[in-house]
Amino acid sequence: MSWQDKIAQGLQRRRDAAAYRTRQVNEGANGRWLQSGERQYLNFSSNDYLGLSQNDEVIAAWQQGARRYGVGSGGSGHVTGYSQPHARLEQRLADWLGYPRALLFISGYAANQAVLTALTDADDRILADKLSHASLLEAAAHSPAQLRRFQHNQPEALQNLLIKPCQGQTLVVTEGVFSMDGDSAPLAALQQQTSAAGGWLLVDDAHGIGVHGEEGRGSCWLQGVQPELLVVTFGKAFGLSGAAVLCQEPVAEYLLQYARHLIYSTAMPPAQACALQAALRQVQQGDALRQQLQQRIRQFRTAAAHLPLQLGASKTAIQPLLVGDNQQSLIWAEQLRAAGLWVTAIRPPTVPPGSARLRITLSAAHQPEDIDRLLEVLYGLCH
């Protein structure tokens, strides 16, 4: 088989399964609106949960940072790319979340890959929730450690794995809020079991940080746990991009020595770190935004419960409507778009086979009439 045949067959498999991914060129998108071509859509596919991507103070902080520091960092943080804005942001994140140290990464994907591959050896094991994000499962699979997956959000399933012998160390991996179903992990139970077995817990709280808990401190704070490793990302509630790993002092120093994604990547621009400090202030002071988001979630769920579709058991901004069939989910997404509503159809392999869905994400930027319009169109599609 030639390279051309290999590529052609792989693409055809995705087309045959109605799982072919495409990108849309948009003129601009934020928590409420998306501009594509000449048309404006109500945006129900954004992770901009608090609408901070369009916040004036955050934008001004980036502009001021760019004027002072330029638009790039110029190198890895281990060479010349680590500046005062990076150091200040790390310290403020650590103080806010109650950890001695925070380390910045260019993305949540890079952070998860770096931590799992740097910390584990061949005699270690990684026990991961089977619905963990692709970055976690891929990193675990590529790490030298043995990977075992436990049934989603089932502490008893984790316990059955923990009681089995392991020559090395055990790292349990989960998310605070799961990105496709919007449900939350039972973090207190998972931490209790992990600690009793002498293991460490890693929580990726990409979709919980900024949204849950006092000052938006996230899922772990809300459930009263402090995992040994906490990954937070800035592409959701913070409205920007990037990530940080929160940990103890020796772990941070270890990662600085061994985390290849940290060592060999150009650091985020200092201007971005300036904007993230402004976003952090908005998150900390964002109780009103979080209350607005919760109101939109309650409004949607109350009415969507009457739709002839399975509504996911989510109390978060991620509200999946399960369709099942790949092609039907695409048809409905197109019909919603024709009505001026941007909703994304999520299909395998991103989600398990037979669980194609309309993944609706809500934002504090949405207005009550936006939710009413979405529900009106959904009712029309189903009836």
Curated annotation (Swiss-Prot):
Keyword annotations of the record: Biotin biosynthesis, Pyridoxal phosphate, Transferase
N6-(pyridoxal phosphate)lysine: modified positions: 236
Family matches, as Gene3D superfamilies: Aspartate Aminotransferase, domain 1, Type I PLP-dependent aspartate aminotransferase-like (Major domain)
Record SUPFAM superfamilies: PLP-dependent transferases
One biological process term in Gene Ontology: biotin biosynthetic process
Cofactor needs: pyridoxal 5'-phosphate
One Gene Ontology term of the molecular function aspect: pyridoxal phosphate binding
Chain positions recorded as substrate binding sites: 21, 133, 350
Substrates-to-products reaction catalysed: 6-carboxyhexanoyl-[ACP] + L-alanine + H(+) = (8S)-8-amino-7-oxononanoate + holo-[ACP] + CO2
Entry annotated with the keyword Transferase: yes
Binding-site residues, pyridoxal 5'-phosphate: 108-109, 179, 207, 233
InterPro entries named among the record's database cross-references: Aminotrans_II_pyridoxalP_BS, Aminotransferase_I/II_large, AON_synthase_class-II, AONS_Archaea/Proteobacteria, AONS_Proteobacteria, PyrdxlP-dep_Trfase, PyrdxlP-dep_Trfase_major, PyrdxlP-dep_Trfase_small
Superkingdom of the organism of origin: Bacteria
Keyword Transferase tagged: yes
PANTHER family in alphabetical order: 8-AMINO-7-OXONONANOATE SYNTHASE, CLASS II AMINOTRANSFERASE/8-AMINO-7-OXONONANOATE SYNTHASE
Family note: Belongs to the class-II pyridoxal-phosphate-dependent aminotransferase family. BioF subfamily.
Task performed by this protein: Catalyzes the decarboxylative condensation of pimeloyl-[acyl-carrier protein] and L-alanine to produce 8-amino-7-oxononanoate (AON), [acyl-carrier protein], and carbon dioxide.
Subunit structure and binding partners: Homodimer.
Protein name: 8-amino-7-oxononanoate synthase
Source organism per UniProt: Yersinia pseudotuberculosis serotype O:1b (strain IP 31758)
Gene: bioF
